[in-house]
Amino acid sequence: DVLGSRGLGDVYKRQVLPKDIEWHFIGHLQTNKVKYIVPFITLIHSVDSEKLLSVIESEAAKCGRVVDCLLEIHVAQEDSKYGFTLDSCRELLQGGSSEKYPHVRICGLMGMATQTDDEDCIEREFSALKKLFDEVKGSSSVDSSAFCELSMGMSHDYPLALRHGSTLVRIGTSIFGERVYSCF
């Protein structure tokens, strides 16, 4: 607490942020926003379509860098969730994605379970995602040394996700509390 102030500023960007921050993008990413994050992002968790993958490839090529990404897999019983189906993920990876997208490194999979109290449903969805992860990692369609992340589990279901092999969890609500949206 700096004398009660909540808003702080600095004129020098390099002094505001540590140089070793690794920025992960975890939400739904619109194609028109890719150009704003590709120059600095460490990992995009939510690549949910080939169209988005193509835009990331194009923007990463312009920056002369390789962007690490996770393919979002739609395993939930909710239409509001995004992502590749299990089969469309297999097709993408078997189709030579590393040659088609040289500025993108597929580092794993991400998925969100159905928002429910039914733990059996959540277990089935996490189990299906883990099975796909193991299948892909064991295939020749990815670089198995880079393909090591399985991002699943949020504040309400992360213990189940960890039991199913999750390497990354999204637990902002547990840390910061429910998000409050305000009207201006």
Per-region residue spans from a language model:
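Single conserved hydrophobic/aromatic residue that forms the stacking wall/gate
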Residues: 1-12
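Residue-level signal for inorganic ion chemistry
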Residues: 6, 37, 71, 109, ...
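Active-site-adjacent beta->alpha loops and helix N-cap segments on the catalytic face
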Residues: 10-16, 34, 48-65, 117-128, ...
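Glycine/small-residue-rich loop that forms an oxyanion/phosphate-binding "nest" at active or ligand-binding sites
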Residues: 13-48
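Acidic (Asp/Glu)-rich catalytic clusters
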Residues: 14-18, 38-39, 57-66, 95-105
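Structural preference for beta-strand elements that scaffold enzyme active sites
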Residues: 20-24, 42-44, 66-72, 105-108, ...
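Active-site loop/helix belt of alpha/beta enzymes
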Residues: 75-184
